[in-house]
Amino acid sequence: MMIEAYFSAIVFDPCPTCPPGLKHPLTLQGRIGVIADSHGNIASMTDCIQRLTDRRADTIIHLGDIFDSEIHHNLMNIVDVITDNNILAVKGNNDYQIEKSLENGHPMDLDPSDRQRIRQFLHSLALYFTSGNVCFAHSRPFDSIRAFYEPIDTGSTEQAARIFRHTDHHLLFCGHSHLPMLFRWRAGIVTREPIPEQTPLVFQKNEKYIIIVGSADKGECGFIDREKMVYERIRL
C-alpha cells in the first residue's frame, strides 16, 4: 500500500494520571526479550521469562497488559514475578483499568499493604520508552490514554503508516493485538506481513518496522539481538 499524504491532524487527549513516555532514553544493548499481553496468566508469563532467560536475554521487557481487568486474583504474585525478575514494563489498557479500579476503592480482596504496592507499581509504569532509535509501547507510542487502547493492526496498513509518518523510530515493538504481525516501511510503501516462527527477521537500515509481538497468554514472545539486528518470534 502506497503511503498517501495525511492532511488531518492526529490529536491525542492528555493523560494527567499516567506517566508519559520516559523522556530520557534507556541504554539497552545486546539481547532483549519481549513479552506482551499475558493478561494475568502467570504460568504463560513465567514460561516466556524462562525461555528468554534460556536464550541469555540481557533484558526482558513486558509490553503491557500484564494484568487482566476482569481477573483480580494473584495481582500481588504477578507484581512479584515482574519485580523479582527485573522485568522492564510499560502500561497497557488493562493495567490502567486495574489502576483506576484501585484508585476508586474497589476492594479486590487485597490487604491494604498489597493494594498500596500494586497501585505504586502501576503508577510507575510509563506509556512507552525508547533506547536509541528503538521504541517499546503497548500499542501506539504517544502520550495519551487513547494510545494504548487503539490498535495498530486493524487488518490494513493505515494506522502503521500514520505512525511511520509521525515518528522517527527505526523499530517499534508493541502488543495490544494478540496476533504476531510485522509492518514494514520501505521506500514510501508500507506492507503488513506475518512473522514466521522459524526464520529470523533481519532489520535493514533503510527500512522501518513495527513488530506486534503477540500474546504471551497464547504462548507468544520474541527475542531481539541488537548487535546482529535480528528479531525472532518464539512460540512456546
Give short role names for the model-derived ranges.
Residues A5-Y6, A161:
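Non-catalytic terminal accessory segments
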Residues Y6-F12, P25-R31, I35, G40-H123:
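Core catalytic region of metal-dependent phosphoesterases/phosphodiesterases
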Residues L22, S124-Y128, P200, C221:
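Short, acidic/polar N-cap/turn motifs at the starts of alpha helices
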Residues G30-H39, N133-R140, I210-G214:
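Active-site-proximal beta-strand elements of phosphoester/diester hydrolases
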Residues T59, L171, K208-I211:
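Structural motif
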Residues D65, S177, M181, S215:
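Divalent metal-dependent hydrolysis catalytic cores, especially in the metallo-beta-lactamase
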Residues H73-N74, V79-F173, S177-A187:
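Conserved catalytic scaffold of divalent metal-dependent phosphoesterases
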